[in-house]
Regions:
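N-terminal redox-cofactor-binding region of secreted/periplasmic oxidoreductases
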Residues: 2-600
Length: 600
């Protein structure tokens, strides 16, 4: 019955999303030429392409994936997800499938804005001011957040938030529909009991506190960059889009000018290799992993590594170095089944989807409790008094974020394969979760380290452009990241002991994990071991083609000409928040750089 309910829900979703393609498709021919070629139709690539095309330029946007399918969670691990495997380091992700951390990344129009959890957080002004890069201070970048922001419910924010927002931008943003899940308010009340202030706007004067965040949602539907930029009638009239077209390298002339790209197009008849040319510039927006791979395949990267693969070196640059990512330990809190959102009603998802189709409302227009989040500085938490304190400016700089999800009572029963595909967890962990979920709903509250110290690398596994690169995220290699997670788990232990949580028998699930000490004998040892087993990526990797080392201040690749990078790989450090906002701002920013150069 559980599997039947799941299949019916997916059938309803499939019927809705098998509608006519609303995005134009360009049929490519070998040798086609455009003014600008942009590789990757994701968070940054779609805005950049749309802005340049609307300015009157001949723009080709190529995307390795295809059209946009349905619901966010079902897409993780699907064909619309690159689902990059990684090289294990034996100290993280030990209870993931094959002990490999998996990096999800959208492989479709809109990229990761099509499969993420839709949270709109810009980060902290210090994230940009501390870079020390000319033209990339907070005051330089915030106009680009405002340019695309079209906040539809400004009246729900305090008047102090008005200067921080725009209501007329191209990306319509708003609050999620109330899910009906009582934990939505209970999480907030529990954190308030620990003196976390309620913050009505994490993009306003302060990030600190617990909040219901603004999301990339409009009229009950996801607002990806594909929907916000590419689906506009004025954009469709002027922008060329090539789907299912994977870039395999940049073409250079003898003077190191980027003059085009090599691609592989995919269709029912098989793969076809083409060469496409740009009169003016090539812009790589393939994401932190994809952009690094394309650069190295094209001879831009660490010389020793490229020489080892017999790739001619065009520019010896630290491509693929300094990778950082938001990482967390997955923490599960079983709660009394009477507090479950649907209390075992297996067919409620089908009814919810029907209600959504009719009215764009109801629980299916919500993202459950995912829009409830908290940011704080763990060094400003008094563990003896069990309260967050606010006694210095440093307390305004968060180092941790709590994110939430909810597994309803019996929701994952009989769905082992589906859960493993979407989560990447080992079957042993999934089966333990199923046992807990048989009798209780499960609140998932996980602490994200916002500025991790651990650094990883990306290298080519081979010179074959259709093979995944060798990704070594190296999570938890710096012990300071583990210590921050241990602090956050102690705060979670305090949280489940608040009256709001105790009323529903909430407790942190202590999973059986091989090699971990018994909790009753060694609490800290158990949680340290747990962290290394239950490591999970937020899919926010940055830094593989960073500003100041690989790129100049206008996102131009050093050592070559007519080639730029516009995606999260450009950021030397992670923003303190979800990264989609920064990616879109970078796309807007590179369009300005290019238009300014074209005008001069």
């Amino acid at each position: 019955m559980i599997l039947l309910a799941w299949l019916l829900t997916m059938l309803v979703v499939f019927i809705y999303y098998c509608k006519d393609d609303i995005y134009n498709t360009t049929l490519l021919q070998d040798g086609d030429t455009s003014d600008y070629i942009i590789v990757g139709a994701g968070g940054a690539g779609a805005p950049a392409a749309a802005r340049l095309a609307l300015a009157g330029h001949d723009v080709l946007l190529v995307e390795a994936g295809g059209d946009i399918p349905g619901m966010a969670v079902t897409l993780l691990g699907s064909d619309m997800d690159w689902a990059y495997p990684t090289i294990l380091n034996n100290i993280s992700c030990r209870s993931s499938l094959d002990q490999q951390c998996r990096l999800s990344c959208g492989k479709c129009l809109g990229g990761s804005t099509t499969i993420n959890y839709m949270m709109y957080t810009r980060g902290n002004p210090r994230d940009y001011d501390d870079l020390g890069i000319k033209g990339w201070s907070w005051n330089d970048i915030v106009p680009y957040f405002l340019r695309y922001e079209g906040l539809e419910e400004l009246h729900r924010l305090p008047t102090t938030s008005i200067p921080h927002h725009n209501t007329a931008g191209i990306m319509k943003l708003g609050f999620f529909t109330e899910s009906g899940n009582p934990w939505h308010s209970s999480i907030i009340q529990g954190l308030k009991a620990l003196n976390f202030p309620f913050n009505s706007d994490m993009n306003g004067d302060s990030q600190i506190g617990v909040s219901q965040v603004i999301g990339y949602v409009h009229e009950g539907e996801r607002m990806s960059t594909a929907r916000g930029y590419l689906a506009r009638d004025d954009v469709k009239r002027v922008l060329k889009i090539a789907k299912d077209t994977q870039c395999t390298g940049v073409i250079f002339d003898d003077n190191n000018n980027a003059i085009g790209i090599k691609v592989v197009t995919k269709n029912r008849k098989g793969n076809k290799t083409l060469r496409l040319y740009a009169r003016k510039e090539v812009i790589l927006s393939a994401g932190t992993i994809g952009t690094a791979q394309i650069l190295m395949l094209s001879g831009v990267g660490p010389a020793a590594h490229l020489n080892s693969l017999d790739i001619p070196v065009r520019a010896d640059l630290p491509v693929g170095e300094n990778i950082s990512d938001h990482v967390l330990p997955l923490m599960y809190i079983p709660v009394h089944p009477g507090f479950a959102a649907r209390s075992g009603d297996l067919f409620k998802p089908v009814r919810d989807m029907v209600e959504w189709f009719i009215s764009r409302g109801g629980p299916a227009a919500s993202n459950g409790v995912t829009d409830v989040t908290a940011m704080f500085n763990s060094h400003c938490y008094d563990f003896d008094k069990r309260k967050l304190i606010h006694n210095s400016l440093d307390c305004e700089l968060p180092n941790l974020q709590l994110i939430n999800a909810f597994i309803e009572h019996r929701q994952i029963q009989g769905l082992e394969v589906q859960v493993q595909k979407s989560s990447g967890l080992s079957m042993d962990i999934i089966q333990q979760l199923q046992v807990a979920n048989q009798h209780q709903a499960i609140l998932v509250t996980s602490p994200v380290v916002l500025r991790p110290y651990s650094r990883g690398t990306i290298r080519l596994a081979s010179a074959d452009p259709l093979k995944h690169p060798a990704i070594f995220p190296n999570y938890l290699s710096d012990e300071r990241d583990v210590q921050e997670m241990l602090c956050s788990i102690k705060i979670l232990e305090h949280l489940v002991e608040t009256p709001e949580y105790k009323a529903y028998n909430a407790s942190i699930l202590r999973l059986r994990l091989p090699g971990c000490p018994d909790f009753s004998c060694d609490r800290e040892g158990y949680w340290t071991c747990y962290i290394r087993h239950m490591t999970y990526s937020s899919f926010h990797a940055v830094g593989s083609a960073r500003l100041g080392a690989v790129l100049d201040e206008q996102l131009r690749v050093r050592g070559v000409a007519r080639l730029r990078v516009a995606d999260l790989s450009a950021l030397p450090e992670l923003p303190r928040g979800n990264t989609a906002a920064a990616a879109i701002a970078i796309g807007e920013r590179v369009a300005d750089f290019i238009l300014q150069d074209a005008a001069s």
